[in-house]
A protein has these predicted regions:
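Blade-loop segments of beta-propeller domains
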Residues: 55, 83-126, 131
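Beta-propeller blade signature
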Residues: 86-94, 140-143, 197-205
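Surface-exposed loop and turn segments in beta-propeller and other repeat-based domains
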Residues: 42-50, 102-109, 211-230
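Short, conserved, GDST-rich strand-edge loop motifs in beta-rich repeat architectures
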Residues: 71-84, 170-196
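Beta-strand C-termini and the immediately following turn/loop, strongest in propeller blades
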Residues: 69-76, 117-133, 166-172, 191, ...
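Blade-terminus and WD-like Trp-Asp/Gly-His loop motifs, strongest in beta-propeller folds
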Residues: 59-67, 114-125, 157-164, 240-245
Length: 245
């Protein structure tokens, strides 16, 4: 009888590959060890808590390469609830990988964290999303002054010059693409396929002023392959600003 083999997850894959130097196959260099071609790897977080960073398109390192951003929680293997808090920290690679907590967030997920990142073109500002009362917001923390400013909107992606960001409603994402949005605030348009009052907005990171660029209803009016899609469920996800913006 063929024995059932459970699907391999990322953690088990890393365990397996770390135990075997031959997993990644042939090497054309005669006599050279496969591991001699691998980049050096070391763990930079400590303790029993769980650490990670996301998303992969965000700036995790400061411009000097000394300071690394990370998130910390005390659980795994379940979906975050509205009550779960993630801790935000800076790791100093030149001081024995010292962890310094700089804040927390009530708006996060495993896939993309809380959009934690260094603000582009800045060597002192860090931004991440949070939930305060019944609103998703974003914080900008200055590592030199220790001061934090709070913007009235959550951000999704930041312009390359670090002056503005694009965002959308994370309650809508959580409703239609669970895991990529945030728990804690129900989607007020859960019964609408193409709401006209929410969409993509642009927010000035200095003034905090925001404006809607276009609504979900606006986008839904654009035909797909010559056919109307206004009867389908719509939301925005995976936003990114062009590098030459």
């Amino acid at each position: 009888m063929k024995q059932y083999q459970p699907g391999i997850n990322r953690r088990n894959f890393l365990k397996i590959t770390s135990m075997s130097p031959f997993v990644f196959g042939a090497n054309s260099n005669h006599g050279a060890s496969p591991q001699s071609k691998l980049a050096p790897i070391r763990k930079i977080t400590k303790g029993s808590k769980f650490h990670w960073f996301g998303y992969y398109d965000k700036l995790q390192f400061d411009p000097t390469g000394r300071y690394v951003l990370g998130m910390q929680v005390d659980f795994e293997h379940r979906t975050p609830t509205a009550q779960d808090i993630v801790k935000i920290g800076i790791i100093d690679l030149q001081e024995s990988d010292r962890w310094t907590e700089i804040g927390t967030s009530n708006a996060w997920g495993w896939q993309q964290g809380c959009m934690l990142q260094w603000v582009p073109k800045s060597n002192s500002e860090i931004i991440w999303n949070d939930r305060i009362d019944n609103q998703f917001v974003s914080h900008i923390y200055n590592v030199k002054t220790g001061l934090t400013s709070t913007l009235s909107k959550a951000i999704y992606t930041i312009s390359p010059n670090g002056k503005w960001a694009i965002g959308t409603e994370f309650s809508r994402i959580q409703d239609l693409r669970p895991g990529y949005g945030y728990a804690g605030i129900p989607d007020p348009y859960a019964d609408e396929k193409t709401p006209k009052d929410i969409g993509l907005y642009k927010i000035d990171l200095k003034t905090g002023k925001s404006k809607m660029l276009f609504s979900i209803a606006d986008i839904a009016k654009i035909p797909s392959k010559g056919k109307s899609v206004e009867d389908q469920w719509h939301w925005f996800n995976h936003l990114l600003v062009s590098p030459d913006s």
